């Protein structure tokens, strides 16, 4: 899949897990960015500790790579309890969930990543566990089947998802705390890169950290991945120190430009400009033109480009914006100049 091969994908990669664990903050005091979330969670955690109660069930949602797993770990550390981790797709049967719940100690945190992918039958078992700290278990089969209730110790369920809209209403309503993580500012990412470099023992100038941060698409996971690749460049072709010049040379070699766009992003935009006169064009035609699957365009390439204003969806299809032409140093076509006089002509919508 194209996303797994991209340096700037926000999706986690298995080989990075051990490296990320080494630089992951463990306390709210070390947590950089997300000031509103940090302040609220500090308040909720202090209140729960003061009452000697388990923290309310917490839902964390937002784009991938922004620190949902990190925040779950911090919650457990701040509460002084153990963390048990799993993910929605892993919990295939009610018994899988029951095995986890019955092994929790009082106050423990159960972290469920990709919670929107829970199966309906598992979700039904989770409702009474979250609300009443009880587990309903069916024993036997057929006419002899009977239900028994098991009491569970108070625990905190922390659910993480990139697609909060896919959660069912009954599940969403059972979370007492709901937090949305936003993309990070370049200033916060610069601080994160500097902190990670210090932990990894990498001499890094402030300008070098800034150069990495501004190409990281607002995402700490991408920033840390770029840092590791720039480290390799500095080790082989530099003197081991990450300066602005070294970071710029390394990231240009890796084909990540100053706005965080890579070859796939630029190919999509240039195809729209050169082959379809800037659009509008249907997503299937666009997919055929760049030899990619439709879902790859919709789920992998488009979101960041739309968010940054390089392209948009209209009732007639995909079109590039003035911002895309300026990014490539191209003159605006006469048609686009005329369209800009009527801003409603290409009003954003979910066109095909």
From Swiss-Prot:
Gene3D superfamilies: 1.10.8.60, P-loop containing nucleotide triphosphate hydrolases (3.40.50.300), Winged helix-like DNA-binding domain superfamily/Winged helix DNA-binding domain (1.10.10.10). Its EC number is 3.6.4.-. Its main location: cytoplasm. It catalyses: ATP + H2O = ADP + phosphate + H(+). Mg(2+) binds at residue 69. Keywords: ATP-binding, Cytoplasm, DNA damage, DNA recombination, DNA repair, DNA-binding, Hydrolase, Nucleotide-binding. ATP binds at residues 23-24, 65, 68-70, 131-133, 174, 184, 221. It is found in: Cytoplasm. SUPFAM superfamilies: P-loop containing nucleoside triphosphate hydrolases, Winged helix' DNA-binding domain. Residues 258-352 are annotated as: Head domain (RuvB-H). One of its GO terms (biological process) is DNA repair. One of its GO terms (molecular function) is four-way junction helicase activity. Residues 185-255 are annotated as: Small ATPAse domain (RuvB-S). Residues 4-184 are annotated as: Large ATPase domain (RuvB-L). DNA binds at residues 294, 313, 318. The keyword ATP-binding applies. GO terms for cellular component: cytoplasm; Holliday junction resolvase complex. Pfam families: AAA_lid_4 (PF17864), RuvB_C (PF05491), RuvB_N (PF05496). The RuvA-RuvB-RuvC complex processes Holliday junction (HJ) DNA during genetic recombination and DNA repair, while the RuvA-RuvB complex plays an important role in the rescue of blocked DNA replication forks via replication fork reversal (RFR). RuvA specifically binds to HJ cruciform DNA, conferring on it an open structure. The RuvB hexamer acts as an ATP-dependent pump, pulling dsDNA into and through the RuvAB complex. RuvB forms 2 homohexamers on either side of HJ DNA bound by 1 or 2 RuvA tetramers; 4 subunits per hexamer contact DNA at a time. Homohexamer. Forms an RuvA(8)-RuvB(12)-Holliday junction (HJ) complex. HJ DNA is sandwiched between 2 RuvA tetramers; dsDNA enters through RuvA and exits via RuvB. An RuvB hexamer assembles on each DNA strand where it exits the tetramer. Each RuvB hexamer is contacted by two RuvA subunits (via domain III) on 2 adjacent RuvB subunits; this complex drives branch migration. In the full resolvosome a probable DNA-RuvA(4)-RuvB(12)-RuvC(2) complex forms which resolves the HJ. Has 3 domains, the large (RuvB-L) and small ATPase (RuvB-S) domains and the C-terminal head (RuvB-H) domain. The head domain binds DNA, while the ATPase domains jointly bind ATP, ADP or are empty depending on the state of the subunit in the translocation cycle. During a single DNA translocation step the structure of each domain remains the same, but their relative positions change. Belongs to the RuvB family. This is Holliday junction branch migration complex subunit RuvB. It comes from Azotobacter vinelandii (strain DJ / ATCC BAA-1303).
